[in-house]
Amino acid sequence: MCIRDRGRYSVLSEVGMLPAELMGLNANKFKQFNNLIKNKYFFNSITSNVENILELIRAKKFNSVILNYDESSDNFLKWYQQLVAESLGKKKSGILPIVSNMPKDNHSVMQLYLDGIQNNFFTFFFVKEI
């Protein structure tokens, strides 16, 4: 699969895929993810997004709120949330990654997002079937 074979990405290695296969998960979906992240346009998009995020942090927007509109991506986004929190939450700095599952959270926390402290930036997360 050729992703990183140790550390926080070891779950995407062949050894990490064995338990996934035994649990009935489709390893081909992980291979599709691997192909996606190897795509140069994907990384151009990430680089552009990082520049935007740095600008938001300079503007004191410290909460990264992902509005998830794809229920099946919840576990993936929790993994992303953990990576961001562990990687950037050091030395009294970082951003707070928050995953809100829509439309459920639309009724429970949207009021806070809209009228509370304005230190959030938002990412809308959708999955388009190909």
Task: State the predicted function of each range.
Residues R4-T123:
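Active-site phosphate/pyrophosphate-binding segments
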